[in-house]
């Protein structure tokens, strides 16, 4: 993993470093490190209010209400074809046995047949399973996954995006400090329900980037350096903050 840790982590000295808000911001650190921006800033660096609103408009967000709705969607880290296919395997794994790719594929197709799904659904399942198998092989080779460990969801990718939506809301003025703070803490709480540590979160996040991309190999090439750096660098928030489980910062 250290061989891939070639990125640089930057910090905003005015931003949170060790509290629950810092934990929330650290969940969006992959994109920030990739873009050479401070991981702990509430705003997007070097972006005017106008530029932030132009960016959000490109994602269909043109008002405070739109921003709130986009946050709600981002905070629902499940529901598409990728989640369904990974969730199907996760259910098979509840017996304590990890199914082979062949069994996963066969039982998924059997379920699709039994529920009268379309040929397109069968094709989508084949594409996703093949991509997941490739991605897990690359992750194991890079040291991101231990041999035999599988990706259970891409919720990390959605939560990372939710942090970005919160930040853009701050930069655009669509969200005031309290609204942005509450959004970030909601991301933090969800992360604690889905993952047990930064490593599991990291694998889910980069897998989501890869599976959403047209070229999953190129996406991994892009995001593996910031992920590896966050996992191993001494100055990383992922090394200096515990993962946000429920009781880290009791009120």
What are these regions (language model features)?
Residues 1-177, 182-251:
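Polar/charged low-complexity regulatory segments
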């Amino acid at each position: 993993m250290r061989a891939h840790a070639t990125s640089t982590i930057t910090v905003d000295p005015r931003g949170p470093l060790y509290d629950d808000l810092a934990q929330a911001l650290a969940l969006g650190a992959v994109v920030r490190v990739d873009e050479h921006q401070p991981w702990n800033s509430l705003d997007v660096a070097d972006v005017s209010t106008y530029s932030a609103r132009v960016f959000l408009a490109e994602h269909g967000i043109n008002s405070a209400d739109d921003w709130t709705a986009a946050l709600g969607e981002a905070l629902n880290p499940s529901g598409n074809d990728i989640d369904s296919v990974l969730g199907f395997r996760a259910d098979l794994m509840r017996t304590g046995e990890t199914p082979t790719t062949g069994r996963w594929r066969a039982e998924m197709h059997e379920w699709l047949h039994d529920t009268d799904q379309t040929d397109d659904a069968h094709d989508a399942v084949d594409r996703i399973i093949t991509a997941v198998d490739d991605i897990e092989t690359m992750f194991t080779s890079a040291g991101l996954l231990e041999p035999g460990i599988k990706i259970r969801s891409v919720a990390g990718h959605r939560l990372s995006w939710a942090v970005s939506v919160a930040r853009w809301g701050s930069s655009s003025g669509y969200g005031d400090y309290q609204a942005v703070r509450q959004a970030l803490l909601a991301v933090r709480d969800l992360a604690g329900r889905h993952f047990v540590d930064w490593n599991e979160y990291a694998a889910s996040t980069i897998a989501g980037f890869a599976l959403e991309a047209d070229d999953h190999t190129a996406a991994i090439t892009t995001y593996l350096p910031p992920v590896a750096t966050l996992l191993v660098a001494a100055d990383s928030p992922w090394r200096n903050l515990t993962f946000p489980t429920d009781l880290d910062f009791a009120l």
